[in-house]
Structures are given as C-alpha cells and as structure tokens.
C-alpha cells in the first residue's frame, strides 16, 4: 500500500539540532515525508493546516513556549500529532504536555532521533494496527482493505470531477 506523504514540521530555535534531525528523518523516511522547519512557534502556527500531520516541537523557545504553541496547534487542527522535544526531564512539564494533547514527550540526547523515528512509524501505521486489533484481521488483510478503500475513494472522486 502506498502511504500518504506525511507533512512534518520541526520547530526549534537550535538550527544545528533542526538540521541534524531533518537529515536523520529524510534518510530514514525518504520521499514518504515532507519536512518543514521553523525557528519559533509563531512562524509554525502561520503554516499549520489540515494537511499538517506531525509537529516535533521544542518546549523552550523565544517568544511563546512549546506548551502554548501545542495548545494553539490543537485548536487549529486537533488531528495533528505533536511530539514535544526538550532537554528538561521535569515530569510536571511532561504531564502538562500530555494533558494539552501531546502524542509523546522526548528528552533531547543521543537516542532522541531514533525515538522520534519510532514515534513517526507508530503514527503512520496506526490505521493498520486499529484494524488488526479491533476487527481481528490479519495485517495483510488490513493493508488490502485500506488500499481497496483508498482506491475506491479516488475512483469516486474522479467520477465526480469528470461529471
């Protein structure tokens, strides 16, 4: 099944870290991701829309902090998955982020990029896992059904546009 290109935003004021993470994700996911980067939350909010799938968001930045930006993202598009990224291991910050709708909370460090890649894989494959778990069908059948439904929607849309 061909996966939809995932629009990923990386928001952090540390440009070296942003460049490193972007390269890591591009190497890992290739053409299946489109990555946009932002130095602050305000510039990110101007670009968030219904097609923004994942935001990797630094907690501490100039201007509004990551928690405020997270809340604004969820107001604009509640379906956008937000991964908070921080160097602070404060449990209260993590709890507040989860309460505001964060999908995950990652501490910056040596294994952070691998963890973020695993989170993205988890987000992308969620529909398949739901079908397997809830309807007790094989993974092959779940992929087949999602492909069939997607193709059906495309055909119906094409017929609608033609007429």
Q: PLM ranges: what are they?
A:
Residues 62-63, 86, 90:
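The feature encodes the CheY-like receiver
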Residues 65-79:
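Short amphipathic alpha-helix used as the core "switch/output" element in two-component signaling
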Residues 15-36:
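Two-component/phosphorelay signaling modules centered on CheY-like receiver
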Residues 24, 115-127:
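Receiver (REC) domain switch/output surface
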Residues 9, 50-56:
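Active-site beta3 strand of CheY-like receiver
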Residues 12, 58-59:
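Active-site residues of response regulator receiver
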Residues 37-43, 66:
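Helix N-cap/capping motif at the beta->alpha junctions
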């Amino acid at each position: 099944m061909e996966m939809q290109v995932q629009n990923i935003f990386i928001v952090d004021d540390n440009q070296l870290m942003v460049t490193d993470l972007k390269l890591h994700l591009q190497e890992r996911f290739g053409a299946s991701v489109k990555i946009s980067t932002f130095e602050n939350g305000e510039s990110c909010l101007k670009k968030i829309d219904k097609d923004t799938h994942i935001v990797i968001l630094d907690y501490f930045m100039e201007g509004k902090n990551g928690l405020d930006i997270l809340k604004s993202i969820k107001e604009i598009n509640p379906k956008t998955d937000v991964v908070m990224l921080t160097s602070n291991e404060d449990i209260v910050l993590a709890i507040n982020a989860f309460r505001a709708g964060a999908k995950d909370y990652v501490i910056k460090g040596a294994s952070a990029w691998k963890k973020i890649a695993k989170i993205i894989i988890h987000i992308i494959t969620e529909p398949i896992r739901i079908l397997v778990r809830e309807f007790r069908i094989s993974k092959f059948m779940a992929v087949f059904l999602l492909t069939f439904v997607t193709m059906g929607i495309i055909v119906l849309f094409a017929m609608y546009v033609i007429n």
